[in-house]
Amino acid sequence: LDIGSRHDQKLALAVEYLEYLGTNEYTADQISTEFYKLACNYGVSTGGEQSYVYLNGLASEFDEAVKLFEHLLQNAVADEDKLKQMVAQKLKSRNDAKLNKGAIMGRLRNYALYGEENPSTYFLSEKELAEISGEELTLYIHNLSNYKHKIWYSGPLELSELDAKLSAVHTIP
């Protein structure tokens, strides 16, 4: 996807939140179990300028895996308790980093290279984290497919067959 955390800091948080979510039909554990049954896995990560979404698995389970992944992205349901736990862990990690010599040196290096406004200071504040809602983050997840993106495929399907299968469940903007 041609969007990253430098475009919107909440996107990275939403992507991290996805792994804790279920849908209107499945709990988070059931989603995990379904992907396991299909011998597939997925992931979403956010860099500064781009985000990456991947789905790995067996060719024989391609249709079902894509369908399940699309279902997860389009129907993820907010879980405020999981969000609170995730935010608490993020704040704890930040506090722990204040005691880590390597992290301190990295922040100091960024300050020396870039000045007061640098990559080490570009994150959501504690107040912003406390105010964010699960509903707001799930909107980011629901909209992932709406961003301009490219699809890379490695497998036995011919391009025409792949296009037909993906077109049935996925829209490319």
Predicted features along the sequence, with ranges:
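An aromatic/glycine/proline-enriched structural segment found at the starts
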Residues: S120, Y147-P173
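Short, charged, amphipathic alpha-helices and their helix-cap/turn boundaries
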Residues: L129-S133
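M16 family metallopeptidases and their MPP-like homologs
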Residues: L1-E19, T23-N75, M86-N95, N100-E128, ...
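A common structural junction motif
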Residues: H71-E80, S167-P173
